[in-house]
Amino acid sequence: MKVRSIGFTINNNNKNINTVDVMNAFINASNREHSRTDYTRKILISDVNDFYYGLVVTFRNQKKNCKSQFVDGKFQLKIEDLQGSDKLANFNFFLIKKSNLSGLYMYHHGSCSLNTLFSHLETISNEFIRNQNKEEIKKLGDKPKQKEVTAINKKYKERLTFSLMTNKNNIQSVLCQF
């Protein structure tokens, strides 16, 4: 299995959103299951010293698995039935440096893509920010002025961005950033 390391960054250009609070929302969402038709996924994140560590576990909803082997110099393919609640699992690991929110994601073919991880994290961060926005509007009272509501909505309009890190430097200089 060929594993690729992909660099990424998380940016927060909105001074009204506390990055640490959003990262804590990611950690608190670690018990959440992301269920789709063909898989269930969990994104587990922890906070240790200078880094956030993450594990993406994807459980495939399939009942067959292909095994291949060479027997007497001949290639054989065997289809194996999974039993009961057995599921195939894929794992991805990542880490994010707290000081600059730069990360490294370990990807292999057929596993959760980095863009899919970004989508899950974006959903969680947007939920957190919308709740923060709603709480601030609630503090205005029962009948807030539309101008005040619009100002609060504008305050939280800019959200976190997630992007691939592209860099022409060699791997040694990239790793020195961590």
Question: Which stretches of residues belong to each language-model region?
Answer:
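Long, hydrophobic/aromatic-enriched structural stretches that serve as scaffold segments
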Residues: 55-115
